[in-house]
Amino acid sequence: SRGLGDVYKRQHLDIQWFLSNVSDPEQIVAYITECTLAELRTIYADQLPPEVSTVPDALSRIKEATGQKFVIIIDEWDVLIRDEASNQKIQDDYINFLRGMFKGTEPTKYIQLAFLTGILPIKKLKTQSALNNFHQYSMLNPGPLASYIGFTEDEVSALCQKYGQNFEEVRRWYDGYLLGNYHVY
């Protein structure tokens, strides 16, 4: 069976990592762009001429050259919304970055799927106009992702057996949540 990586290119952005490694937080979007373009140029040197200066342009050109769309994973997408809430420049730059990545129909030509993790709800933020085409799932509303949020009871039971732990004791310690029809930990 073919995995996701066999069909689509992947691009992972860990926003907390970028924030932790940038020398000046006000340059975070430029740093994300610079690092992402450097990584893409390493892999797709023939498809990215020097004048390519934005991530969306790079992804579009790679898709044109290879025919393959991307799966975009942005881990802790909301860290700049939370940690830099008082810095309007960072907020504006980041929202414009997200808008460039996801707004409108153009990104659908080179992005097959975008998966953003975070603790803040997308639709209730000022980013709504930048991120209004996402389906939002959470622990309170897991939808079809219920079995992927946390560990299912069957997975915890199997791990307990594998590592010689008492399942009932682990169950009492962690209690878990009921998401849809799934008991998760």
Language-model segment annotations:
Residues 71-75, 112-119:
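Structural recognition of the conserved hydrophobic beta-strand(s) that form the central parallel beta-sheet
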